[in-house]
């Protein structure tokens, strides 16, 4: 029972790390990458659809992206979604592909992205702490119901703290790397 609780907590913490990685990947740096477009939704025949499902991405140069829609009829909607996104890009359309040239990041914009990254990191830390709190409540319930002794649960709580610290450190490392990536000119 205790092992199940710890295993479940660790799995949820791993998922929180994966979400944080995805969030950090979506934050724009000076270089183009497909993850920047991860959260952009396109109004495709009246239904909000992720851009990844409607087009393929090519990155011919560090600051340019070619987006090739699978359905040419969706091209104008994809362009509109890109213009309305918070990426700050102006897509160009040549009839077959949508071409995006990413502008250089200004110092002010870099600082804004760092603030966003810190907010995402804090959200991930809160998520980890919530998982820890729920697991601790479950361990307390196990002791209260007499399913395990206090010593056994005490060891499990120490293990839970170690796992939580490991995952918080991983979030901090992701944030540090993202900040370094954003500050690199």
From Swiss-Prot:
GO terms for molecular function: ribosomal large subunit binding. It is found in: Cytoplasm. One of its GO terms (cellular component) is cytoplasm. GO terms for biological process: translational termination. The keyword Nuclease does not apply. It comes from the Bacteria. Keywords: Cytoplasm, Protein biosynthesis. Responsible for the release of ribosomes from messenger RNA at the termination of protein biosynthesis. May increase the efficiency of translation by recycling ribosomes from one round of translation to another. Belongs to the RRF family. This is Ribosome-recycling factor.
């Amino acid at each position: 029972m205790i092992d199940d609780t710890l295993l479940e907590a660790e799995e949820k913490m791993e998922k929180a790390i994966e979400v944080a990685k995805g969030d950090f990947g979506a934050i724009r740096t000076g270089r183009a990458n497909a993850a920047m477009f991860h959260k952009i939704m396109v109004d495709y025949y009246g239904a909000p659809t992720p851009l990844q499902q409607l087009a393929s991405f090519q990155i011919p140069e560090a600051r340019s992206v070619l987006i090739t829609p699978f359905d040419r009829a969706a091209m104008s909607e994809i362009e509109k979604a890109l213009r309305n996104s918070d990426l700050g890009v102006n897509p160009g359309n040549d009839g077959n592909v949508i071409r995006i040239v990413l502008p250089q990041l200004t110092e002010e914009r870099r600082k804004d992205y760092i603030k966003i990254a810190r907010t995402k990191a804090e959200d991930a830390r809160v998520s980890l702490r919530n998982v820890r709190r729920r697991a601790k409540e479950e361990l307390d319930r196990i002791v209260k119901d007499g399913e395990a002794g206090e010593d056994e649960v005490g060891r499990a709580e120490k293990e839970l703290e170690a796992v939580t610290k490991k995952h918080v450190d991983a979030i901090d490392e992701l944030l540090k790397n993202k900040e370094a990536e954003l500050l690199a000119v």
